[in-house]
């Protein structure tokens, strides 16, 4: 379960940003998870709540959005979006030789601080 490691790393960054801003508390966190990142939203939520105990982010509201994977199709020379790691064909030309160019794992999109 790599969600615990992702949660720990995200919390380190969140706490650093909160401290730099002089915040007393983190009340909201918005994360973006890549479609091919193999991150389970429910496991991430559980792990995030666990690692936040006793920190500035304890009790914060966690928002998770899934990012579509962006791929480059050599055949039709277009960027395309895929929503499932199980369907890896270009929706425009049905080519199966796609290069994934953006599926950024986990990104912190926004923080709400007090």
UniProtKB/Swiss-Prot annotation:
- The cysteines covalently paired via disulfide bonds are none
Q: Which key words tag this protein in UniProt? A: Metal-binding, Nickel, Zinc
Among the GO biological process terms of this entry, one is:
protein maturation
Give TM segment ranges: none
Note the superkingdom of the native organism.
Answer: Bacteria
Q: Where does Ni(2+) bind?
A: 2
Annotated GO molecular function terms are: nickel cation binding; zinc ion binding
Cross-referenced InterPro entries: Hydgase_Ni_incorp_HypA/HybF_CS, HypA/HybF
Which of this chain's residues are annotated to bind Zn(2+)?
73, 76, 90, 93
Pfam families named in the record: HypA
Which family is it part of?
Belongs to the HypA/HybF family.
Functional description taken from the UniProt entry: Involved in the maturation of [NiFe] hydrogenases. Required for nickel insertion into the metal center of the hydrogenase.
Listed name of the protein? Hydrogenase maturation factor HypA
Q: Which organism is it from?
A: Klebsiella pneumoniae (strain 342)
Question: Gene encoding this chain?
Answer: hypA
